[in-house]
């Protein structure tokens, strides 16, 4: 959420702990509204996102079950290791009454890369470059275009999907080789690799 940008700027959450979910990606939709989706959630309650949003990356490589990287353990009890500085969604969540969280998500005040990089620009000289890289990458291989190709069955659609995947891989590799990005910043600046995204 935009309100949480200060927590990133203050260093509570390192940039490497943030991942970008791009418009067009398929994601779980557990709320009651449809502000974040292009279509009604279908099988497994997933739908394509209509807006970009930043979120804390989960621990491990698996999308489900997702586990917060800030969930720790003390004396056998689960504890939030950043409780005093937890993000708005975490402060809003109450497991037995999810309506406030659903309303928050419906409001749609999500932080995106452009906003975050603009906020970081004063103290991070590479923020403008990150914004340029994100825009160039999005223009060449958006998640929405990629999933349109994935849905197609023609030879042309399959060829276009393979082309987008190759470009995505090459763009990421070049960013790291030219030292424009550290590997752990790729999920924030460029989003997750297209070939690794969950599919409907």
Locations of regions flagged by a protein language model:
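Hydrophobic scaffolds flanking metal-cofactor catalytic centers in soluble metalloenzymes
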Residues: 1-154, 159-162, 170, 174-178, ...
